[in-house]
Curated annotation (Swiss-Prot):
Keywords: ATP-binding, Glutathione biosynthesis, Ligase, Nucleotide-binding. SUPFAM superfamilies: Glutamine synthetase/guanido kinase. The lineage of its organism: Bacteria, Pseudomonadati, Spirochaetota, Spirochaetia, Leptospirales. PANTHER family: GLUTAMATE--CYSTEINE LIGASE. Pathway: Sulfur metabolism; glutathione biosynthesis; glutathione from L-cysteine and L-glutamate: step 1/2. This is Glutamate--cysteine ligase. One of its GO terms (molecular function) is ATP binding. It catalyses: L-cysteine + L-glutamate + ATP = gamma-L-glutamyl-L-cysteine + ADP + phosphate + H(+).
Length: 520
């Protein structure tokens, strides 16, 4: 059975002020990837530092694709400021455990080895879950290239509070159905996809990269600066472009968000159906988990994803089918090089306003035609976002992008005023003011600011990265932890190794868990 779409009349039944008062109580979580580098900006060749705990089982600090690619995760919290502070504590802890290394401040990678296979995959020990993680990463390298997988980013996890949902849906929490909650989050996801190009312009920080990332650009045209730097003049987020986290193979799958059933059905197809090119990779043992379009659900690239927390060895799709959507994961944020922790409060506050607007506006199903138009908008902004002449698709006609973006940002102000009224601060209105400046002057966007500085100072991308990384290291070396943080992190380091050892004592499983509830 398809879940019902929320209508504007349903939205208007509930007082906007009451809704927004409760919206302040949403839950937030942050994940951030960062490369460990040597003082000269080259990728670290060392294993994951033992003092940071096990990269398999530590709750706060793991590794992503590559062994030197740190992945931080904060607890879900009712105030995003607490997430940022926790992320800061994790950086302080890391810097004080690293001997002579730095944390790279950009989404685009540092100086990479000449041979792609010299980029070390994450290593997680001899347990079956640890081995699967490394095999999965080996498969990613075969499919998309190891260089591409070294791009890092920030993920913002968001869920509405139960009090907010009770007010919005007009019923007691005990009467919620998973279908209603899932429908609400899919409503938000569809509208977010209709607005994500605005967020990409405002937060994109990757218009430039080191040539070792893309030694042979092929037909893609980049400008060269000095000896080692390539850039695209008006680009905002090359991380989200075809040289980053996109896949033409995945684009053929037709995965949409019009209903949970449709989404899960297409994802089930993707994780169970072999793709001819990938079949050949499986000739070598442990080359990949399987030859399917997606080895596992996490391989799917999208600016936003519906999520449910799996239990034990449960697959994410089974978790979604059993319990519905619990939260959404926004994956379109570049690392902010002008924030030591890689993300700033103003950008997250503005993102929250977009999510609220996405909920409080009608959100019809996305047709194939609209899906094409939305992808065209996003791709245009990725490559030409700071071009003052850029036009995008808006309701079937072309509009100047910067005019449309400024107008949209200003339209969120009435939400911001109500939220600020209930928090007693001007956080949300200041977030809008912060973004409006970027619409008035593209050089104030992080992508414009970064590229302008590199060109005007006549320095290399790698030089700017080292400079920022050293500044951040000095700052984190002097900052104080939040109370109790050091003891908590030291205990987690010990606990993570104990759990890893227990996993390695268990009987080895030979097959990755299958999705039980798929019909494919």
């Amino acid at each position: 059975m398809k879940t019902k779409e929320l209508t504007q009349s349903k939205i208007e039944e509930v007082s906007l002020e009451i809704l927004l008062r409760h919206a302040v109580k949403a839950k937030h979580g942050l994940e951030k990837e960062s490369m460990r580098v040597n003082p000269d900006g080259t990728l670290s060749g060392t294993t994951h530092p033992i003092h940071l705990g096990s990269s398999l089982t530590n709750h706060y600090i793991k590794t992503d694709f590559a062994e030197p690619q740190l992945e931080y995760a904060t607890h879900p919290r009712p105030k995003v400021e607490a997430n940022i502070r926790e992320l800061q504590d994790l950086h302080i802890f890391t810097i004080r455990k690293l001997e002579n290394e730095l944390i790279w401040p950009f989404s685009m990678p540092p100086v990479l080895p000449e041979e792609e296979n010299e980029i070390p995959l994450g290593q997680y020990g001899t347990s079956h879950s640890g081995r699967w993680k490394t095999i999965y990463r080996h498969g990613l390298g075969l499919r998309y290239g190891r260089r591409m997988q070294t791009i890092s980013g920030v993920h913002y996890n968001f869920s509405f509070s139960k009090v907010f949902l009770r007010q919005f849906l007009g019923k007691e929490i005990s009467n919620f159905t998973k279908e209603e909650i899932s429908s609400l989050y899919l409503h938000v996801i569809r509208n977010f996809l209709r607005r994500v190009h605005f967020l990409t312009y405002l937060t994109g920080s990757s218009p430039v990269f080191d040539f070792t990332f893309l030694p042979n650009p092929g037909s893609l045209k980049f400008e060269k600066h000095k000896n080692f730097t390539l850039y695209s003049t008006y680009a905002t987020s090359l991380r989200m472009s075809e040289i980053g986290y996109t896949s033409k193979v995945q684009d053929t799958l037709g995965i949409h968000y019009n209903s949970l059933e449709e989404y899960v059905d297409r994802m089930c197809y993707a994780v169970h159906t072999p793709y001819p090119k990938y079949v050949s990779f499986s000739e070598n043992k442990d080359a990949q988990l399987n030859p399917n379009y997606l080895q596992i659900e996490n391989e799917f690239y999208s600016p936003i994803r519906p999520k449910q927390i799996p239990k034990g060895d449960e697959r994410p799709l089974d978790a979604l089918l059993q319990r519905g959507i619990e939260y959404i994961e926004i994956r379109s944020l570049d690392i902010d090089p002008y924030s030591p922790v890689g993300v700033c409060r103003s950008n997250l506050a503005f993102t929250q306003l977009i999510l609220l607007d996405s909920l409080l506006k009608v959100s019809p199903s996305i047709s194939e035609e609209e899906n094409f138009s939305l992808k065209e908008n996003l791709n245009s902004v990725i490559w030409e976002g700071r071009n003052p002449e850029l036009k995008i698709n808006v309701n079937g006609s072309k509009r100047n992008f910067q005019e449309a973006g400024a107008e949209y940002s200003e339209s969120l102000r009435h939400y911001a005023k109500i939220l600020d009224l209930h928090t007693g601060r001007r956080t949300y209105q200041e977030a809008i003011d912060f973004q409006i400046k970027k619409w008035k002057n593209p050089d104030k966007t992080p992508s414009g600011k970064l590229l302008s500085e590199i060109l005007k100072r006549n320095i290399e991308f790698r030089e700017k990265g080292i400079e920022l990384a050293q500044e951040n290291k000095r700052m984190f070396s002097y900052l104080e932890y939040s109370p109790g943080t050091l003891m908590k992190m030291e205990k987690e380091t010990i606990r993570s190794f104990q759990e890893k050892e227990e996993l390695e004592k268990q009987e080895i499983q030979t097959q990755y868990p299958t999705v039980k509830l798929c019909n494919h």
